């Protein structure tokens, strides 16, 4: 990592911007929780797609239950979900917002997505076109 100083301790490496360079972790903590959350999201997405193809609501309660379980497990294990996943889930009824009931762009530059339960989720899309969330930015440990 760095060179040893006079006291025998490692001197930290700092780049030209003043950022402390830290090696990425060798393992991911709570990897089994992430696998479980990923599986629940994928199976819910599969059930939602199966419902759309069959044009029936037979799979809807099961898909919503998977999303609700994913939310409860992430809270219980204190594991944060990525913002891209949070944007696709209705907080009230735990549905995936892939086929919204109503979709509109408001006059203030926000995208309004209405779920089947009537909940409206707003995304500010006109404020800053160059805005990226932390997980979408270049140079963080998630992209390494």
UniProtKB/Swiss-Prot annotation:
Primary enzyme class: hydrolase
Keyword Hydrolase: yes
Keyword annotations: Hydrolase, Metal-binding, Nucleus, tRNA processing, Zinc
Cofactor: how bound: Binds 1 zinc ion per subunit.
GO molecular function: metal ion binding; ribonuclease P activity
GO cellular component: a single term: nucleolar ribonuclease P complex
Cofactor(s) demanded: Zn(2+)
Pfam name, any one: Rpr2
Top-rank taxon: Eukaryota
Segments for region (Disordered): 1-22
Chain residues that bind Zn(2+): 90, 93, 115, 117
Keyword Metal-binding assigned: yes
Record's subcellular location: Nucleus
InterPro entries documented for this protein: Rpr2/Snm1/Rpp21
GO biological process: intronic box C/D snoRNA processing; tRNA 5'-leader removal; tRNA processing
Reaction catalysis annotation: Endonucleolytic cleavage of RNA, removing 5'-extranucleotides from tRNA precursor
Primary site of residence: nucleus
Position of the signal peptide: none
EC number(s) stated in the UniProt entry for this protein: 3.1.26.5
Assembly mode: Component of nuclear RNase P. RNase P consists of an RNA moiety and at least 9 protein subunits including POP1, POP3, POP4, POP5, POP6, POP7, POP8, RPP1 and RPR2, many of which are shared with the RNase MPR complex.
Function comment: Component of ribonuclease P, a protein complex that generates mature tRNA molecules by cleaving their 5'-ends.
Family: Belongs to the eukaryotic/archaeal RNase P protein component 4 family.
Additional note from the record: Present with 2070 molecules/cell in log phase SD medium.
Protein name: Ribonuclease P protein subunit RPR2
Lineage of the organism: Eukaryota, Fungi, Dikarya, Ascomycota, Saccharomycotina
